[in-house]
Structure formats: C-alpha cells, structure tokens
C-alpha cells in the first residue's frame, strides 16, 4: 500500500514545537511520501473569515499561504520552508534512504535532523542554486564532516575512553561514505565513482562472478544468453566491509563483509530502486574456488 501523508503548517493553536511533534509522529509511520504544506487562506473559507481572530497574516496573491499566526512567527514559517525542501530532496525522492536512516541515529528526533540540515543549507547558501543528484550527496557528506559529526564525536569519544576523537569521527564518516555509495548504486549504475567513494573491495571476486555460469544462472536468471561483458554492463557488483542495511538501521557497524549485486532490469515500482541481492564473501570465495579446482 502506497502511503502518502500530509502535514499542514500554520493551523490555529499550533506552535512550532507542536508541529515538530506532529512531524515526528507522522514520520514514525514511515510513509512513502511525507508532504509538508502550508495553510492556504482562500476567500470565502472559514479560515478567511477568522484570519484576524487568529492573527493569521497570509499572501494576498496565489498561493495565499500563511506567513505568520498568533502561534507561529514569520521566522518559524521560513524555517519550516527549509525543512519542507530537505524532506522533499532527502526523504521523498527515496534516493538517500539508507544514508538518512543512518544519520537519524545521531539526533533525538527525525524533525531535528531535517531542521539542522536545512539550517546548514541556509548557512552555506546552498538553497540559492539548483543542485544535481551527485551534488546533493556531496553536500550531505560535507554536512556530516563539518557540522553534524563534530557535535557528537566528543560524546562518543567520552563514552569510549579507548578511542580518541579522530578515530571515532573517522569511523562514522567512513561508514556514511559506504552507505552513501550503496544509495547511489541502488538508483543508478554509475559511469564514474564519486571522489569520496571507498576503494573497490573484492574486485577479483566481482570480476570472476560474471564468468561463473552457475553463479549467474542462480542470481541473474533473466540474463540467460547474455555474455559476461553484457551482464557486467547492465548490472553492478559492489563489495562492502559491512552489512549496509543492518548498519544503517542500527547506527553501528554490523554484519560480515558482503558483495551486493544491483540488478537494474528489476526495480521497485515505488522507489525505483534496483533489485539488490546480498552475496556473502565466503560464498563467492567458495564458489570461485570450486570452479578453479574443477
């Protein structure tokens, strides 16, 4: 079931903190789309008649949106506009699913993450220009390096006396880079890897996979008749030192090394993500070894 939920800001009796609570409540429902909107004061409506009573100031031209109320200031509305943009880009697009899931662990509530990211965009002037998909990833990484992790590293290091601050910071950033790479390949078979991407892990195993008929028949049955080169071009294999999804869900390094197979011929109809199959490194090694011995 496709779940699309709307939140309207600027309603009477709802202040900024109450809206934050409503956002967090709705976010926990994990809708496919979370749409933030702003109260429209249309002529002839009940809200139009009560605007003065509620202290509602609104645009006199389309889209007639609220600018402030007795409970929410103009600055509050502007901040929520920023949150709306971040939710649209980083949540509703489904292009950053695991990255956002991971980063959520460093905030008390989902709203706080989007609010902080919006403030970072404003601080750096990023909201004034259009950005491509790869640029959005670069900004998210910059956000983590310069703002987000800088706040939590001290607490994490204090909790683990055996690690110094740089080590904890580095671990968190490297985990994020791996998760971001996962999100990128989930949507697109990249022609070139981003500069921040990890080294290609298990390259020999990935190369041998496409030449192993038993493996391709098992994991890529719809590519029967294709050559190894054709399968390699239409799919992607990426090795990771961890279980990406388990790590993103827990906020900590989880699982054993694995190779993920991204099949772009089969996609999720709602998120457009490629079909992903996890193959353990031990399984790959065993299969390739048997073929070599045979």
Residue map of PLM features:
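Radical SAM enzyme core and accessory elements
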Residues: 85-294
């Amino acid at each position: 079931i496709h779940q699309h939920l709307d939140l309207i800001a600027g309603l009477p009796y709802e202040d900024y903190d109450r809206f934050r609570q409503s956002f967090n409540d709705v976010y926990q429902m994990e809708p496919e789309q979370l749409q933030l909107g702003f109260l429209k004061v249309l002529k002839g409506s009940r809200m139009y008649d009560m605007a003065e009573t509620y202290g509602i100031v609104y645009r006199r031209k389309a889209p007639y949106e609220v600018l402030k109320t007795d409970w929410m200031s103009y600055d509050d509305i502007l901040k929520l506009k920023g949150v709306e943009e971040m939710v649209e880009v980083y949540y509703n697009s489904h292009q950053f699913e695991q990255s956002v899931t991971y980063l959520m662990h460093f905030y008390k509530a989902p709203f706080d993450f989007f609010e902080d990211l919006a403030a970072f965009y404003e601080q750096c002037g990023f909201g004034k220009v259009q950005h491509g998909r790869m640029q959005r990833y670069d900004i998210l990484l910059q956000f983590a390096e310069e703002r987000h992790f800088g706040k939590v590293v001290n607490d994490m290091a204090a909790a683990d006396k055996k690690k110094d601050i740089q080590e904890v910071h580095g671990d968190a950033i490297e985990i994020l880079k791996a998760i971001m790479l996962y999100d990128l390949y989930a949507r697109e078979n990249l022609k070139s890897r981003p500069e921040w991407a990890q080294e290609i892990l298990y390259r020999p195993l990935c190369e041998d996979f496409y030449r192993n008929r038993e493996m391709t028949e098992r994991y890529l049955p719809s590519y029967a008749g294709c050559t190894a080169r054709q399968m390699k071009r239409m799919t992607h294999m990426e090795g990771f030192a961890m279980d990406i999804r388990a790590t993103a869900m827990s906020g900590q390094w989880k699982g054993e090394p694995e190779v993920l197979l991204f099949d772009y011929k089969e996609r999720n109809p709602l998120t457009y993500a490629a079909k992903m199959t996890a193959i353990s490194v031990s399984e790959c090694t065993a299969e390739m070894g048997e073929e070599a011995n045979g």
